[in-house]
């Protein structure tokens, strides 16, 4: 029989391992003055069947991928067999394990198996015998210039908020890594071992959890925090690593593993260089950075840019899209992709061409950084089953084109008068991108940006937080500049969130799809982008206070007509607390704005006299983000001596956090600020680089406006979500696909 889905036991074992692996052992010396003791965790095999069971039959192997060299960590018989055996609950675990033998010996050992009779136990023994611990190629790094009390802390007036910022500042010492030169394998195929790691020459900060290597777009928000922490050498080192990758590969890959070499991530390298130079005044880096920035932009222009004709104006533009050349499962998510393609419940299996195209779409979805979201599905409400309708390559995304526009603007500024010709060229290209964004992606009636869908030759109608990318990057449509009312209308959904929900702004308002880039999840980078977009609005458009809904209406009625493409009743519900637990707030009308009433938690800070609407929303966003991070950290064992005692064991037991000292999560719930986010292909990760970076930026930027948050009691929180959901331990539903949905999707396959 064909392998079908992850077994519950494997998922539970993987969840337990993930929580244990999230706790990094360190010494107790002054942060940064000594190398922390890094505990390399080795996952315990948790196969989906008994060790004596024969492996399920396999689908035919996908084509070999020219961009991925090797037969162990790239698509092939060995990788597919280990994944079909489901040795680990997270497919990334295996591909992060260096071999303990030469490539030839590992392949020879594997060739001894008869794949029609091989058992789970034989594969487990093979992996245990021929592979070492995941992440062994990295070692903890000392941050020699670490300052325990950076100047930004003086901006924070609330004692608890200040102490928490200082605590988070100290986490950099636990996330700093170097390549462990003694554990590096020689270049394939020679040497005594093989590894998937791309060795880097300089210190870097990892996101945390399963993300053991340097990542591209994560590093932008990590750098925002490192700058506040005055760790400028670490910022420089991060940029040097990226420049090494551009020199070696012609682009910056998604992350520091060979299995990422067919795709990039949102191209924020030039943004990072600009911020570093702007803060430090170190222009010496530009001698190397400018030519390599040109090379990266050329890669995006040559590999990800197409001509698009506007149905609105008949003008033609060169616009970028995410489009990865790939015809096999992603090695780090092999089983997930394999099951998406080869589900036995399909009444009509995909053809080879359809499978190859969907593999390309799955990889392209990962390149967006939003892996995955209903934003890129042809049938958004289907959630995980809808991954079969992924239409990433046929969308012209708001985010990517906005970033590339600003990259050209920043590069022109970095050139200045030293190369007027290059500067002028980039400004000209930027003007073309800007015109395309305003024509194709901006809806002047709805006062929002939407991705342009090449399949329908029209804008999508799904409202996402990506709408704020253009203004963050300096593209402000004339309609926004026309009046305070219009400027507010662009941010009206943010106002709705701070009135209707307890947390921060979700990715979309499409909820419980099982996809991690949908509601109720809210992500640190998006909160940063929204706050920066608010800061970009000219002050003459922000003097009025927040508008008030008319009698009988709610803040939903302040949102421009059609902007959300959902009725008020279709928006996600906000669970109530206390005596009203186990029910949601009223869905429509004035009572839907629960933060003006009782039965909820308000964490918006304190208003000041004469505060305009822009500043009110910034204050609300800053405090809510701080509350989400601090409360979920406290709920998982975090404490601050003299200010915030650790929760009793009876409450920590609700979050499986006894013995833990607080987790910094990668994503949060906008419904429950005690909780991490939900869903996705892997369990929620702790660490966490970009969460820390955004929090330190918020502390530095809004420190005087921060107040100690009100965290809802965990007992109440546990009545509105499952125990696992309370800490974000909701297993991926990517492999749990119903026959009805799959049969429908096979019929409706649109790619």
Could you say what each language-model-derived stretch is?
Residues 50, 55-59, 63, 67-68, ...:
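Extended glycan-interaction surfaces of carbohydrate-active proteins
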Residues 725-751:
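Cleavable C-terminal sorting propeptides in eukaryotic secreted/cell-surface proteins
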Residues 242, 276, 300, 411, ...:
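Alpha-helical solenoid scaffolds that mediate protein-protein interactions
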Residues 209-221, 229, 391-417, 421-424, ...:
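Active-site core of glycosidic bond-cleaving carbohydrate-active enzymes
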Residues 245-289:
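Aromatic/His-enriched, Gly/Pro-containing loop or helix-boundary segments
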Residues 293-296, 423-441, 618-626:
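Short amphipathic alpha-helical coiled-coil/interface segments
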Residues 3, 13-36, 723, 745-751:
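N-terminal signal peptide
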